[in-house]
Design a protein with these regions (language model features):
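Domain-terminus/edge residues, biased toward the C-terminal soluble/receptor-binding domains
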Residues: 149-150, 161-166, 170-233
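Compositionally biased, intrinsically disordered low-complexity regions enriched in proline and serine
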Residues: 13-15, 43, 228
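Active-site-adjacent loops and short helices of periplasmic peptidoglycan-processing enzymes
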Residues: 17-173, 177-181
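Sterically constrained small-residue positions within well-ordered secondary structures
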Residues: 7, 21-23, 227-229
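Sec-dependent N-terminal signal peptides
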Residues: 4-13
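Hydrophobic alpha-helical context, especially transmembrane and signal-peptide helices
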Residues: 7, 25, 92, 210-213, ...
Length: 233
């Protein structure tokens, strides 16, 4: 019988068999954990380096949630959208569709990241918190090291392809556990099916959650998917 919550982090394919059987998967690296007990049920090269793609956004969210928890950031605080953030919304990447000069609340940016996987929202949040995305990436890597992600380095807030933005499925598991244990009140956002943002006060944009597992009636409640041409899903 499946436990209440299981985390499966994988590259390129879904786990094809029941966890109690002999598992054969095509993924180069994978890890499966019973969240409640902490038991690792399956792993395959868990320390192999990968490009985390949009799973990078888990750490982007964690940085913001930690600051909110400490009182150094507020959900209703607004950040002004820079040209750098806007350009990502016009470059074919997953986006929240912000415009230069928009003033967007931290809550909307976070939901734009978590639900719509907006790369533009990531940059806006990073710049609002740290001044530059580069400084924010330093904060991300520092946090990763602090919580035991010893084979991870972040160079950007969105996971856009960069050979120096890397992690492992084991480290992504550590990061995911940290998110759920320390910020349960916000974790529910990861299972929201859609996000609506009305930048003009009359022309709302509604986007569905980028996590396809949420639509499969299999009990998934998150967390994040990622795709890069070099890694696939």
């Amino acid at each position: 019988m499946f436990r209440k919550i299981l985390f499966l982090l994988f590259i390129q394919c879904f786990l094809a068999q029941n966890i109690s059987g002999n598992i054969e998967i095509k993924a180069r690296t994978a890890i499966l954990q019973d969240y409640l007990s902490g038991e690792i049920l399956y792993e395959k090269e868990p320390d192999r380096s990968i490009y985390p793609a949009s799973m990078t956004k888990i750490m982007t969210s964690i940085i913001a949630f930690d600051l909110i928890k400490s009182g150094d950031l507020k959900l209703d605080e607004k950040f002004i959208i820079s040209e750098k953030a806007w350009r990502l919304s016009t470059a074919g990447y997953s986006s929240m569709f912000v415009m230069v000069g928009d003033e967007v609340s931290v809550e909307d940016l976070l939901k734009g990241i978590i639900v719509a996987s907006g790369n533009d929202a990531c940059i806006a949040l990073a710049e609002g918190i740290a001044g530059t995305e580069e400084e924010f990436a330093i904060m991300m890597t520092s946090k990763a090291n602090e919580i035991g992600m010893l084979n991870t380095n972040f160079t950007n807030s969105s996971g856009i392809n960069d050979p120096d933005n890397y992690s492992t499925v084991k480290d992504i598991l550590i990061m995911s556990n940290y998110l759920i244990r320390n910020h349960p009140e916000y974790y529910k956002w990861f299972s929201e099916i859609e996000f609506t943002w009305d930048r003009t006060g009359g022309d709302p944009i509604t986007q569905g959650n980028r996590n396809p597992l949420l639509y499969k009636n299999m009990g998934a409640d998150g967390i994040k998917t990622g795709y890069l041409a070099v890694e696939k899903y």
